[in-house]
Each structure stands twice: as C-alpha cells, then as structure tokens.
Amino acid sequence: MTTPNPGQRLGLLGRKVGMMRIFTDDGDAVPVTVLDVSNNRVAQIKTVETDGYSAVQVAFGARKASRVTKPEAGHLAKAGVESGELLQEFRVSAEVAAECKPGSQLPIAMFQAGQQVDVQGTTIGKGFAGTIKRHHFGSQRASHGNSRSHNVPGSISMAQDPGRVFPGKKMSGHLGDDTVTTQNLDVVRVDEARQLLLVKGAVPGAKGGFVTVRPAVKVKLKKGAN
C-alpha cells in the first residue's frame, strides 16, 4: 500500500447520475456508478503568503444569479467565473496551486481508466431508526413469554454501579445523512466527450447528490506488482 503526497490530491466536484453495468472484453458484467464532473472551474487560488495555506477553490454546476448572495457573486465575478451550486476547496501544495489559474477549467483527463479514487458524498437520510435497522441488532423472541418486547434493544446499562449509561451506547436515533468517503474505487472508464466518470461499485448518496472525487490516498497495489 502506498500513500501519495496529500498536496497532490486535487480533485473534481460532480453529481451522481446513477448506477448501471458495463461489460468487459471478456464478457464480465461490471457494476459502475456514473458521475457527472463537467464544468469544474477554478474560482480562487489561495497561497501561503496571502491566506496562510495553499488551496484551489473550485466551483461546480450552475445557479441563477438571483439565488447567489452578493458577497459570493462579487467573489466569483472577480475571477470571471459564473456562479455554481457548489463551491469547495482542495488543499494542495504550492506547486500544484501555481499550475491553476482563476477562471480555468479543470480537465476530466486528470483521471485515467484503471486509477483508484476516493469518492465522498452524503448518504441517504433514513430519519429516526431503531436499533435493528440502525445497528443490525437481532429481534427478541416472538413468543414463549415475550410480551411487547420483540424489537426493543434490551438492557442499556448495568446496576447501581456505574449507575449510568456509558457514552456511545448503541441505541435508537437518527440514521443516514452523513458525509461518507468510499475509498479505492477503480475508474473503469473516462468519457471526455460527455464529461462522465464511471467508477466500479457504489458511491454514497442518492441520484443527483453532490460528490467529490479525489485520487486515492491509500492506493492498493495490484497482485503481482512490485
């Protein structure tokens, strides 16, 4: 396992289109998630001298001018960039930041087929959920003396000592709507004409949800590689 320089992890913002399957030359079916990463534009370059750190601010998507606050509209107009639905920073090295210019487009060609990437998204919200759905608890007995305690978690603490419920106890509560990163997904295909990335497997979030695609930070070596 190798770890690339974190300063080189400039990525792309996108939207989850959905899942499908494609077939390899050998006839194997591969499940893939289609990501739309079109129109990623540089909104600002941050440097150590002016901001205390190096970063590239990227805008994605389109938004009506009436839906943009005046400070953000002025900030984007300074770089000559149209307003977007998403505005996010990527912490990079000074060398990488120097290669980007405000108003320029980030090419999808920065990713290649066979490369491993980390995809971050917001999981689907499930609302208030019980312990069976939230923590995969098992149900209690359906009969044999069990009365109205089929799906309850059971005891949540001990006795007078310690006399409290320990923090972190698995109980009912809100499920989903979390920021999750799925690591080491293989890029199966890069469609430059339609600005689409096809990555193997599932990606966090619902259709239409925003995602962030970065080069994998924990690259797994293929079998047989030195």
UniProtKB/Swiss-Prot annotation:
The gene is rplC. GO terms for biological process: translation. It comes from Leptothrix cholodnii (strain ATCC 51168 / LMG 8142 / SP-6). It comes from the Bacteria. One of its GO terms (molecular function) is rRNA binding. The keyword Transmembrane helix does not apply. One of the primary rRNA binding proteins, it binds directly near the 3'-end of the 23S rRNA, where it nucleates assembly of the 50S subunit. Keywords: Methylation, Ribonucleoprotein, Ribosomal protein, RNA-binding, rRNA-binding. Part of the 50S ribosomal subunit. Forms a cluster with proteins L14 and L19. The modification N5-methylglutamine is found at Q160. NCBIfam families: L3_bact. Belongs to the universal ribosomal protein uL3 family. GO terms for cellular component: cytosolic large ribosomal subunit. Methylated by PrmB. This is Large ribosomal subunit protein uL3.
